[in-house]
Amino acid sequence: MPSPYMDRPGAAVRLMVPDEDISFTDRIKGPQTVNLARHCGDFIVRRGDGAWSYQLAVVVDDALMGVTEVMRGDDLLLSAAQQIYLYRLLGFDPPEFAHVPLVCNEQGIRLSKRDRSLSMEYLRENHTPEEVLGIAAHRAGLIPSPFPISLSALLQLKV
């Protein structure tokens, strides 16, 4: 039931979630079960500024684009349960998920675009594609040291 406060300026819209388990098998992390109410709680689907939330936008966008596999950082593992709930609520089949370890620098701080941690320009000028893949695979814990590796060899790794 819509809240009488939904039309107030600056009001965010939350989706009330049931006390329900969402189970899925992550390609990297294996079987997962998340209780929406306990682990996530109700979550915003429309922000106070009127923009749609990331959770809703990514589900609708991926569903309409026919995305069947999603790979992202393991810091977003819990949000997979929210998204699976949204997929089902909207009548879409959820994709398969693979959550990989975050890529961190030597101090253990996550590399991010927001912090301008590393630029593609720098990588192109200073490394071969195989070196970049090797560095990324090593930082993600996929190979023991940052040696150059081809994309085909990387895809053959058993994670």
What are these regions, as identified by a protein language model?
Residues 1-112, 119-123, 144:
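Active-site cores that bind ATP or allylic diphosphates and position pyrophosphate for catalysis
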Residues 107-159:
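Conserved catalytic-core subdomain
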